[in-house]
Amino acid sequence: EPGETPAWERLVSTLYSPEERHKIEWCIGAIVTGESKKLQKFLVFYGAVGTGKSTIINVIMQLFEGYHTSFSAKDLGSSSNAFALEAFRANPLVAIQHDGDLSRIEDNTRINSLVSHEMMTVNEKFRSAYSNRFKTFLIMGTNKPVKITDAKSGVIRRLIDVTPTGDK
């Protein structure tokens, strides 16, 4: 039986257009139903400071309390960071970064493989390397435009971008 969510209705309809709201709720639904483990998508909230990106991300964190972790997109996009996947070692349902930066990703291979749920080699400090297939759905907020260096990269078609209205 459908319930009522007046606080969510008021919050999300103020901060986001109906189209952007649909994207957010679609992603949440995909995570709840387990479809996100098969989908090759990730969610990026892009907008000015103070427009509600972290507000919605905080709600998502509360929904998946105990099933999320934090990550660094900068580390994932750096070919020199051998331990970038260490944050995913527990294979969380959701990985979140409130204030990320995808404007200067030098190598998007790792992000693409992670979002595509491909087998990856994981290096953890003080442990032997091992392989894992992560089923994690990535969510991040950013104030900077996303810039993918390789126009043919799979990251572009996997990105779901959400922009706030700027209303308060």
Give the ranges of each region predicted by the language model.
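AAA+/SF3 P-loop NTPase mechanochemical coupling elements
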Residues: 83-90, 122-141
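Conserved nucleotide-binding/hydrolysis micro-motifs of P-loop NTPases
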Residues: 101-102, 143-147, 165-168
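A short helix-turn-beta junction within AAA+ P-loop NTPase domains corresponding to the substrate/partner-engaging
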Residues: 151-167
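Conserved AAA+/SF3 P-loop NTPase catalytic/coupling segment centered on the Walker-B
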Residues: 92-117, 130, 134, 148-155
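P-loop NTPase catalytic core of nucleic-acid-dependent motor ATPases
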Residues: 1-93, 160-163
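Substrate-gripping "pore-loop 1 plus following alpha2 helix"
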Residues: 71-80, 109-128
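Short, contiguous acidic/charged loop-to-helix segments that flank catalytic cores in large enzymes
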Residues: 15, 73, 84-85, 100-103, ...
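Short, polar/flexible loop-turn hinges at active-site or ligand-entry regions and domain interfaces
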Residues: 14-20, 146-150, 168
